[in-house]
Amino acid sequence: MGNVLAASSPPAGPPPPPAPALVGLPPPPPSPPGFTLPPLGGSLGAGTSTSRSSERTPGAATASASGAAEDGACGCLPNPGTFEECHRKCKELFPIQMEGVKLTVNKGLSNHFQVNHTVALSTIGESNYHFGVTYVGTKQLSPTEAFPVLVGDMDNSGSLNAQVIHQLGPGLRSKMAIQTQQSKFVNWQVDGEYRGSDFTAAVTLGNPDVLVGSGILVAHYLQSITPCLALGGELVYHRRPGEEGTVMSLAGKYTLNNWLATVTLGQAGMHATYYHKASDQLQVGVEFEASTRMQDTSVSFGYQLDLPKANLLFKGSVDSNWIVGATLEKKLPPLPLTLALGAFLNHRKNKFQCGFGLTIG
């Protein structure tokens, strides 16, 4: 299932409800305001979160591809994953923009309960403090999965982001997310996902209001056609006073041992990504986006260099708008410290932005 609630404080007002925007079921094409899941651990970097979870990408890609090959050999089709995950593997290679200084302290109170404190200082936006809580239940499904999961984050202004994830049965998972802005209720979202042996179906309901007659309903479906090829689609229905509409998108994903190609085509435009695992240390990705509404296209190239022996993770990117960015994450053993540095340069606008982050625990 995709991410649905932002770990950062909500924007100054309720986000506008364009149809695809309320579906934060990822992260992103661009992440809609208020709909990205905060990481279960602490965050790194300044002004944003950068976790080492992406380090598992190479192994996951190889395991997924080898599993697909084995399924094909026995005549079975593999589960294709979720619709929101189609472009995620490529996007994880790109550095996340950082600005200012950020300090995060993580503290595990038990095997199931963790808290974290985050202080962010910025020269562009507002400086803030966040308190986060994560609870992971005792229903163990795999070495890396346990349910229910409760995640909450509150900032110094009293704005809250929270969500609950639970496995209701074999293949059936549900999630509920809410967001408040100080004393005002801003967003809420409920979704359910079912994973079959060779398909995944999901339904999301966002901000339903029976009295006003507004809300967003999103349906996703992804089906394995061959051990390597999966096809699916997305249907978004949105309604509010004086406006009603439907947006449909189709998606295709082709996976081999060391690369993955994905394309999404719909009324809003086209989104294509290519991920390639060059070696155990190097991964590269290319992303193409075309928007019919903005009448604009862009191409981005990103790569990730992982040096486990040096406890170093580097990400870099450049796009067709001449924006160059890079982040460096360095663990400092034997101390429980992680240092993050980031810089972005926009050549067209002559703007430079950098950030520094330190995570303890």
UniProtKB/Swiss-Prot annotation:
Residues 1-71 are annotated as: Disordered. Residues 1-10, 37-52, 59-71 have a biased composition (Low complexity). InterPro entries: Porin_dom_sf, Porin_Euk/Tom40, Tom40. Gene3D superfamilies: Porin. GO terms for molecular function: porin activity; protein transmembrane transporter activity. Residues 11-36 have a biased composition (Pro residues). Pfam families: Porin_3. It is a multi-pass membrane protein. Keywords: Ion transport, Membrane, Mitochondrion, Mitochondrion outer membrane, Porin, Protein transport, Transmembrane, Transmembrane beta strand, Transport. GO terms for biological process: monoatomic ion transport; protein import into mitochondrial matrix; protein insertion into mitochondrial outer membrane; protein targeting to mitochondrion. It is found in: Mitochondrion outer membrane. One of its GO terms (cellular component) is pore complex. Forms part of the preprotein translocase complex of the outer mitochondrial membrane (TOM complex) which consists of at least 7 different proteins (TOMM5, TOMM6, TOMM7, TOMM20, TOMM22, TOMM40 and TOMM70). Interacts with mitochondrial targeting sequences. Interacts with TIMM29; linking the TIM22 complex to the TOM complex. Forms a complex with BCAP31 (via C-terminus) which mediates the translocation of components of the mitochondrial membrane respiratory chain NADH dehydrogenase (Complex I) from the cytosol to the mitochondria. Channel-forming protein essential for import of protein precursors into mitochondria. Plays a role in the assembly of the mitochondrial membrane respiratory chain NADH dehydrogenase (Complex I) by forming a complex with BCAP31 and mediating the translocation of Complex I components from the cytosol to the mitochondria. Belongs to the Tom40 family. This is Mitochondrial import receptor subunit TOM40 homolog. It comes from Homo sapiens (Human). The lineage of its organism: Eukaryota, Metazoa, Chordata, Craniata, Vertebrata.
